[in-house]
Swiss-Prot record:
Pathway: Cofactor biosynthesis; NAD(+) biosynthesis; deamido-NAD(+) from nicotinate D-ribonucleotide: step 1/1. This is Probable nicotinate-nucleotide adenylyltransferase. It comes from the Bacteria. InterPro entries: Cyt_trans-like, NadD/NMNAT, Rossmann-like_a/b/a_fold. It catalyses: nicotinate beta-D-ribonucleotide + ATP + H(+) = deamido-NAD(+) + diphosphate. Catalyzes the reversible adenylation of nicotinate mononucleotide (NaMN) to nicotinic acid adenine dinucleotide (NaAD). GO terms for molecular function: ATP binding; nicotinate-nucleotide adenylyltransferase activity. Belongs to the NadD family. The gene is nadD. One of its GO terms (biological process) is NAD biosynthetic process. Its EC number is 2.7.7.18. SUPFAM superfamilies: Nucleotidylyl transferase. It holds the Pfam family CTP_transf_like. Keywords: ATP-binding, NAD, Nucleotide-binding, Nucleotidyltransferase, Pyridine nucleotide biosynthesis, Transferase.
Amino acid sequence: MQEHSPIVLLGGTFDPIHFGHLRTALELQQHFGESAEVRLIPCGDPRHRSAPKASGEHRLAMLRLALEGEPSLRIDEVEVRRTGASYTVDTLLELRQEVGNLRPLIFVMGTDAFESLPKWRRWLEIIQLAHIMVVNRPGWSFCEQGELGDFLRQHSAESNNDLIRQPAGKVGFITLTQMGISSSKVRELIGLRLSPRFLLPDSVWRYIRQHRLYGAVNA
């Protein structure tokens, strides 16, 4: 691993992990090159959404099963192991202490999350600790008004190469494969006693049945 190779941070509830998450992680790794490290960070106690249905231990176990055989992707337990409320700025502060001040950190978020960024705790500190990579969705256009518009004009990257030339401070955009899979849809199917196969790895589906998560029956 090169000293200043980027670390790409993909957070989420992963409740459960599915092929949409995995494809996103793989495409991010391929985009930034073989030296890039992609970390999937399952959330702990998120303040901006309802608590996950499965425990942190179960979600970690499903992630481990899903990532078997893919060494370019790894799990970071920083938020799951934290007690109390979990905020992105605290996660980035911990990661900065771990990797130092020179290595690029690239925090990935969707368009909805980016538009709500000014509501996040100590949001202006986030860009001091990491870059932000926004995953475009089809038909999305950004309204460049208000404080977020000013923020983007100040920090917008000319190209995504800017995100690997310095440790933090830039906002980039990327278009990835849209798979139309959601964890809530997987849970809905399970609750209806319908199979979610081909939406998530078979190993994860077996684990869900084994532990009767989301109302699954171990058949």
